[in-house]
Amino acid sequence: MARLADYFIVVGYDHEKPGSGEGLGKIIQRFPQKDWDDTPFPQGIELFCQPGGWQLSRERKQPTFFVVVLTDIDSDRHYCSCLTFYEAEINLQGTKKEEIEGEAKVSGLIQPAEVFAPKSLVLVSRLYYPEIFRACLGLIYTVYVDSLNVSLESLIANLCACLVPAAGGSQKLFSLGAGDRQLIQTPLHDSLPITGTSVALLFQQLGIQNVLSLFCAVLTENKVLFHSASFQRLSDACRALESLMFPLKYSYPYIPILPAQLLEVLSSPTPFIIGVHSVFKTDVHELLDVIIADLDGGTIKIPECIHLSSLPEPLLHQTQSALSLILHPDLEVADHAFPPPRTALSHSKMLDKEVRAVFLRLFAQLFQGYRSCLQLIRIHAEPVIHFHKTAFLGQRGLVENDFLTKVLSGMAFAGFVSERGPPYRSCDLFDELVAFEVERIKVEENNPVKMIKHVRELAEQLFKNENPNPHMAFQKVPRPTEGSHLRVHILPFPEINEARVQELIQENVAKNQNAPPATRIEKKCVVPAGPPVVSIMDKVTTVFNSAQRLEVVRNCISFIFENKILETEKTLPAALRALKGKAARQCLTDELGLHVQQNRAILDHQQFDYIIRMMNCTLQDCSSLEEYNIAAALLPLTSAFYRKLAPGVSQFAYTCVQDHPIWTNQQFWETTFYNAVQEQVRSLYLSAKEDNHAPHLKQKDKLPDDHYQEKTAMDLAAEQLRLWPTLSKSTQQELVQHEESTVFSQAIHFANLMVNLLVPLDTSKNKLLRTSAPGDWESGSNSIVTNSIAGSVAESYDTESGFEDSENTDIANSVVRFITRFIDKVCTESGVTQDHIKSLHCMIPGIVAMHIETLEAVHRESRRLPPIQKPKILRPALLPGEEIVCEGLRVLLDPDGREEATGGLLGGPQLLPAEGALFLTTYRILFRGTPHDQLVGEQTVVRSFPIASITKEKKITMQNQLQQNMQEGLQITSASFQLIKVAFDEEVSPEVVEIFKKQLMKFRYPQSIFSTFAFAAGQTTPQIILPKQKEKNTSFRTFSKTIVKGAKRAGKMTIGRQYLLKKKTGTIVEERVNRPGWNEDDDVSVSDESELPTSTTLKASEKSTMEQLVEKACFRDYQRLGLGTISGSSSRSRPEYFRITASNRMYSLCRSYPGLLVVPQAVQDSSLPRVARCYRHNRLPVVCWKNSRSGTLLLRSGGFHGKGVVGLFKSQNSPQAAPTSSLESSSSIEQEKYLQALLNAVSVHQKLRGNSTLTVRPAFALSPGVWASLRSSTRLISSPTSFIDVGARLAGKDHSASFSNSSYLQNQLLKRQAALYIFGEKSQLRNFKVEFALNCEFVPVEFHEIRQVKASFKKLMRACIPSTIPTDSEVTFLKALGDSEWFPQLHRIMQLAVVVSEVLENGSSVLVCLEEGWDITAQVTSLVQLLSDPFYRTLEGFQMLVEKEWLSFGHKFSQRSSLTLNCQGSGFAPVFLQFLDCVHQVHNQYPTEFEFNLYYLKFLAFHYVSNRFKTFLLDSDYERLEHGTLFDDKGEKHAKKGVCIWECIDRMHKRSPIFFNYLYSPLEIEALKPNVNVSSLKKWDYYIEETLSTGPSYDWMMLTPKHFPSEDSDLAGEAGPRSQRRTVWPCYDDVSCTQPDALTSLFSEIEKLEHKLNQAPEKWQQLWERVTVDLKEEPRTDRSQRHLSRSPGIVSTNLPSYQKRSLLHLPDSSMGEEQNSSISPSNGVERRAATLYSQYTSKNDENRSFEGTLYKRGALLKGWKPRWFVLDVTKHQLRYYDSGEDTSCKGHIDLAEVEMVIPAGPSMGAPKHTSDKAFFDLKTSKRVYNFCAQDGQSAQQWMDKIQSCISDA
């Protein structure tokens, strides 16, 4: 029995406490006056009576009622029912104006009778009967307001003394004594919540989806806040949400109605369910981590910072469907043509229970089998039960499910386990459901009818729980008279006689004590165990669980114990791979356990090594999210298997398996300990007959595959708990002591196990104390290039591991601390006495000390073991000039994140891991070794890359499955898209590793470029003068002086600059080296007085410089394009608008530009320096290319200087005599003049082009929108599109502001395209004056900054060469590639280039002035030229393009590639690589337009970062001149300095067609227009391919074939036949070499045949030329075919310059009809096959059936010429040659086309002295051939031979 009401309280308005703001309430009276012993009086009740604040009112308000919930310190709920009414106030002296609602100032008078103060009657109870409380308080109010003749004292006394029976379904009829008759209906089970209709109301208010979101939020411990205008609705909503959680109980702050004064509680860090009134909703919307539900508006708001976990599928879908069927039954039939009569919803109380039934079913499915994962630790005196969370998640298949993981870790579930864990207790609806109905729920999930039926059955039970008696007795409660609260004269609530109430309460209590207690005996029973845990998805077992893999593991273990070493070696790699699967790992522990039982635990050294490797492989994959079963099963085995090292010294397996993170995971030890204790407690209560189990720690009741034994631990516990009350005190005490001693003994046992696994064998190398979890790209990196990678986080083990605060040296103390912490936790939870815990604490240090002492002997003896035979270190093949710096360090090449070489699911051999050595040479870092897997064979694995390409190097700690002594490792990443991840062998000391790393750094960042490998190949290295050195290098000093003198003569040097050079003579190189980059402008000032001398006045030294400059690619390209002549030349026959100036020949104008520049003819050299000031780094606009078709020009420059920057620059460097303003204005004026000169010259070109006879494509023929986007609105008023669209298109935006919109321009400008378009940065174009823009247009462009390019490159590397396999299955290669943002950057570059190309094609010139002018500018200008000019798509042209646009125009190769020490921190920026990738994209779309193939691009991409060549070493021609590498001066002692990549490519191209594109067949189109959409771009295989057989092929291809490091060379000398079949592995072999294309294969075959025949090898180009000519001669069936195959003729014309001949000469008159045949060189090479056909038809070169000289008449000029004719019966041809000795066939006649051979008569021009019978005609289907023989006999002979051939055919 329990009291209906604990306290009755009267709370009123407090007039005595003055307040500036809200009023206050005070307790006027309370009953009883003393607290009950079992229930304290609730504090702060006056706040909760008026949650909106105590306020006076001018209106008579209706009485209100709501229920407030208070929670005490013991987490007990108190339900405070508040009935509030308003009394008229008489005395207002204590009130203030601000406290009165709706106060009106009427003549300054206040009407006292109009003011009302609230008063609350509060009833506090621990029971929840809201309707009873409403009736009781209403009755007291009725007696007061209607002045009934009833004593309030008796009512209150009866209320406080009324007792109510506990749950059980009984009824209680009572009366307070005011003519009332009330009935209390108790529920059947007090564990089931009572909801009335609140749940149904909540769904009606918020909807299904919103309530499910709130449900998940509460279960995953988020903060939930309701707001509504109704306090009672808030109370109902909170109760409804909490009741949905059943069987879980909410254990965080639960405040359905929060008072205004306590709103700061919402900032609490703990989760909560709180309700507030809607008037405060503006205050709560600022909360960042609170989910807010608006009950009145039906919405919820989830902040962005909250990731709300949702129910796992399929449960989420099933729950939504079930709720929809219940709440919206008409939805299913809404679309029916003939819907049934509207089915009425269940009444609200039943609907409420149906919704709750759905959630009850949900929890039954969610917690299915939970009892099988309970771990029983103690039974007596109180059950102690632990839940094995990881086992449950693992077996449910929800290890990675966020929702269930959070639920199981929450406080609510902990309470669930402690309440429902005991196996003997009272059961309720949920216990029956989860034990017996889960299978039914699963079967019915796809049958809505059955599902609804089950839901309604459950709803009936829930309804019956709240309403057990259907026939309710009659109730009567008087209500107040209607409108009683509006009466004018109502006396205040009377003061109640407290003494009288107290007296009546005492009487009632005494009366109740005498009455017999109606106690309900709680019915306890054994809780049914229910079905075992099963996977929620019923997934099919994975591929690893196949019986075949388990058989491999079993066989391998059998071979080990039978000492069959050879069979073990064969099966071990397969067994290790199989151990990736959970079933195989379980199989291993079972098999090893069997061998322990058979007393086969003593192993020899080889067996011990194999067993350790298998154990390590098994433990490697036991993550913290797994069930820990495998590691727990291995735990006793590690102390069972051992080997004898010496008499009395044995080494156990645990010494070799310590380096796994699971041993430092306290959660693992706790779970395993509780399992062991459960087994021991079970054994304790089983009889000897039943106690028949294996000695090692089994977990039978955890594994679903095992059969349960007759009695589980829970069964025994239920039996013991049932018998416990019947046992005597002594027996009970004895059982408690037995259990405690069991736990204590297990604690000692586990302390020993932990010591075994935590104390390392070598105590000087405490690995566990300094091991961190294997990191990824970002963790703990020692980045070479930059340390700016965000989030370098060194991950550690579980925070409870005990090692986070330990020192590396004190092993014993750290181990003791860890074990002590574990012992404290488990023993306290298990109820072990403090004395036992203290004794354990004293015992642990002694155990650790003894173990360390024992291990010293083991360690000493283990070092005396003979070393395991290790693979022989293979010496790598070296390149010419390459030297080994560090001899090979023995390492293991570990697999990284790429799966290709690891076998596994992708198939193929397991090449990695590979054992070998890591070498450091002067050029490369190189690994060479052999695969560890014996079955792969004797394959050599090579992985290498140039040292200069290293972008990142970091130390790592690797979990290695092969050798336990290889842990410390190194991970090195290369910009050539390669990664070396190695673990060092135990023989490699840390000191050697440090030396290796220092040497690596030394060669990665050399002191100067002469230390790089480019200058190492047998070359003499020029000395660089450093500041501290005393020696002087004459050549450098002379050179420096030459530069200084030249600059002085040009008038370009200030006094300060001269002084600097005088002081530091010969240190120009060092000065450049000390500057990390051109971060400042060239420190050269301009003098207006002097001008540059013309070329006629050049001195001797300058003339030699000029001679060398004109040999450079820039000048040669200028000449090719016809861009003017050197200034000063007097031999100009026609006016030229551009000239080549030599003003920068000494690089005084701009250091990053070439020596010769193309500028407008009208501009004087003297004004160029002033113009240059207006541009970044003095990079003024110069012409770099001319479109030969349209005559338009492409110009480039640096970005414009901002006004402030220009002013600052000029004020610093201007001479004192010149005022700043005048100098600034002079530069500005010069810039205007220069731009005007450019415009004039460009416009002239445009006019010339317009007047010429060339037809130009009109603007409307352009691709849609180009001109529309380039014309501004000012130029073409009618056009809806502004020129800004192109900028927006390039910037990836839709809208942009237009710069040129003045009315002046609208009137002035013509409606035509501009002569010049300036593509620049939006921020800089604003500085330009509008007057400049009369005939030019500014196009704003946005582009990726260098930092974005760097970040994208890092992500691209992470995608292409990941260091580890991603743990998240969603992170695929393609997703990582997409996230890198690499393709959008390529798209932006190509899009800009295509637009510029189209503009140039259509008659307008373009100036590109972006950034500094050497990154994106170089990419765009070179790509534009490649698209527009076919010459640049040849090998020679592409070389010229790169030399001109990238090398001469000053791309910062050194800085962007971090090639030198000064650039170390700048990071790698792949600007040139992006350009090559863009070329690759174009090549993919136009494969026939390029003379070079894709391998050529890969070759350049590899070697521009390799430092193999000097070409890409420095940042400008100026620096190359400083270092003496710009010109190859033949006269100097050092004949050559370094190797040039173009020379190497030239040699390679002459030797073989390695760079040649066989498809090359250019079409005469205006410009290439590739599709630049991201979807059209392809990934470049350069990023992902590798060749493990030899390493990258880009180095070896330069050598002659005899130098190739090929494995086939070893077999060449073997006698006997060999099979030609060979397996090709894509990641191992170079597929292009092992499976060459048909043409390459034929070329190599011909070369072999030449070698066999001892013939002089013919150049492949000549052979290719003859082949293509021969293909041209093959007759075409029609004209269209002939038109389509015109390409071979162009092939010959586009051959490189060294083999160009006069191939396209006019044919002679006698051969006019055979024009194709004339395109052939004549040479004196000996006779050989002329066509490919002959290689396969005959052993002889040709089949000559009949041959001789015949005169043949030409088809065009009708001339007669003698030719040598050969009749070939085999090929059915009549071929002809120039002479009998000629090997090159000039043409042939196909005899299949011959219709007849007839004699003919003589014709004009025939040879003299020829018989008339010597003439005959050959008629074919196409034409008639006229022949003349030497005489009639010969003619007849020819006719007979030809006729016989035709007849035979």
From Swiss-Prot:
Protein name (database record): Myotubularin-related protein 13
Residue ranges of domain dDENN in the record: 326-427
Domain named Myotubularin phosphatase: residues: 1108-1584
Alphabetized Pfam families for the sequence: DENN (PF02141), GRAM (PF02893), Myotub-related (PF06602), PH (PF00169), SBF2 (PF12335), uDENN (PF03456)
Family: Belongs to the protein-tyrosine phosphatase family. Non-receptor class myotubularin subfamily.
Domain (cDENN) ranges: 191-324
Keyword flag tRNA-binding: no
Classification via PROSITE patterns: DENN, PH_DOMAIN, PPASE_MYOTUBULARIN
Region ranges (Required for homodimerization and interaction with MTMR2): 1629-1682
Tagged with keyword Phosphoprotein: yes
Gene Ontology CC entries for this record: axon; cytoplasm; cytosol; endosome membrane; membrane; perinuclear region of cytoplasm; vacuolar membrane
InterPro entries in UniProt: cDENN_dom, dDENN_dom, DENN_C, GRAM, MTMR13_PH-GRAM, Myotubularin, Myotubularin-like_Pase_dom, PH-like_dom_sf
